[in-house]
Amino acid sequence: MRKKVLITGFDPFDKETVNPSWEAAKRLNGFETEEAIITAEQIPTVFRSALDTLRQAIQKHQPDIVICVGQAGGRMQITPERVAINLADARIPDNEGHQPIDEEISPDGPAAYWTRLPVKRMTAKMKEHGIPAAVSYTAGTFVCNYLFYGLMDHISRTSPHIRGGFIHIPYIPQQTIDKTAPSLSLDTIVRALRIAAVTAAQYDEDVKSPGGTLH
């Protein structure tokens, strides 16, 4: 039975004119394989409404799997995230000027949630297709981590049958014309997210393989 996969991306923030997470996600809207049917929704880069928008999308689409995607300018690889932390600590304001500092996302929630996606399998599959990828162990403390933590808190409390997680992606080339920062083509990012969605639909459990970081 094919799995319904919801992929989300953010609108542009921090003076950018595009956000590759949404540019990639919307290309996958309506994509179907033997394993998965993908729908896409845009999320505002706003602490107060990001999670509300995601909850509405989950209610609308009734997915089996949720993959939230965000821009991580400066990263060189596609990075599926392993853990979300219960902290909002914004270096810059969000798109409505909110800048929470040292605030808990959920006062009665745990310190962290693990992803429910097979991130090591996803990373390995991307590499098999020539796409630079690595498991990440920090999703930051801005709206990306806020949404990731909020997603996991929501499904843990209300929809334990849903598997969810987060993937960070690099800039696309048009964003780096005036920056000394790495980028990946939008086509490559779209391929990576398609591989991630199909892999998540195929495998409920992750593989035990060497990973982690030394620092």
Swiss-Prot record:
Classification via Pfam families: Peptidase_C15 (PF01470)
GO MF annotations in UniProt: pyroglutamyl-peptidase activity
The protein's Enzyme Commission number: 3.4.19.3
UniProt xrefs under InterPro entries: Peptidase_C15, Peptidase_C15-like, Peptidase_C15-like_sf, PGP-I_bact-type, PGPEP1_Cys_AS, PGPEP1_Glu_AS
Taxonomic superkingdom: Bacteria
Main location: cytoplasm
A biological process term (GO) from this entry: proteolysis
Catalytic activity entry: Release of an N-terminal pyroglutamyl group from a polypeptide, the second amino acid generally not being Pro
Keyword Protease: yes
Broadest EC class assigned to this enzyme: hydrolase
Keywords of the record: Cytoplasm, Hydrolase, Protease, Thiol protease
GO cellular component, one term: cytosol
Residues annotated as catalytic: 81, 144, 168
Family: Belongs to the peptidase C15 family.
Described purpose of this protein according to its UniProt entry: Removes 5-oxoproline from various penultimate amino acid residues except L-proline.
This protein's name: Pyrrolidone-carboxylate peptidase
Organism: Bacillus subtilis (strain 168)
